[in-house]
């Protein structure tokens, strides 16, 4: 079974390297979501779907943050070889989410150099966040048939409640909290992330 990794906003495919190195007994691929041509959530969704539709072997989608939302949304598409989902720090509903709106406002106010220091692009971060402010995955989660592993860091307070809500909606799901884990678990807690994911993959066999 192949693992296909989807990174978060402000990250790159490289963000999954440590996790991939800890799961080398599974073939894997980390998709670079954004480029100069692919610079919106809708374009990313279309391109990743086209890529996944061409997969010829069974695969599991592993996503963090934006990548998790993308994985969950794509689970409602026609993907015959999709077997399961691993979602980390996944937002469920950003429409009407005051904290997300405040974050978007801060993004708009921060100077470009702050983003550049983090290796991020301000216009991309703001543009994609604008698209996501109407996101509501409640209906998709409620009808998702795939076995799903939900992972959240104990320090990721903004996403803990949405992950608990996802766990209630996803009838075939497991929920694991990583102690002292922040939002960016693929970077901060790769060993723990890989161990939990490995246990889930063994459970699927």
Model-derived segments and spans:
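Gly/Ala-rich beta-loop-alpha elbow adjacent to hydrolase catalytic centers
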Residues: 63-71
């Amino acid at each position: 079974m192949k693992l296909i990794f989807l990174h978060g906003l402000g990250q790159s495919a490289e963000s999954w390297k440590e996790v991939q190195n800890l799961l080398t007994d599974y073939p894997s691929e980390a998709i670079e979501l954004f480029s100069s041509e692919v610079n919106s959530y809708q374009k990313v969704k279309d391109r990743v779907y086209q890529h996944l539709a061409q997969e010829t072997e069974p695969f599991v989608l592993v996503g963090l943050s934006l990548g998790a939302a993308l994985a969950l949304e794509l689970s409602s598409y026609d993907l015959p070889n999709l077997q399961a989902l691993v979602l980390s720090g996944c937002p469920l509903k950003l429409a009407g989410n005051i904290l997300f709106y405040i974050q978007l406002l801060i993004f708009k106010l921060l100077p470009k150099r702050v983003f550049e220091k983090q290796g991020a692009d301000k216009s991309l971060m703001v543009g994609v966040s604008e698209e996501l402010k109407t996101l509501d995955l409640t209906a998709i989660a409620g009808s998702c048939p795939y076995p799903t592993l939900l992972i959240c860091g104990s320090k990721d307070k903004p996403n803990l409640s949405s992950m608990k809500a996802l766990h209630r909606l996803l009838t075939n799901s497991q929920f694991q909290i990583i102690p002292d884990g922040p939002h960016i678990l693929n970077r901060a807690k790769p060993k723990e992330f890989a161990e939990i994911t490995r246990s889930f993959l063994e459970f699927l066999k």
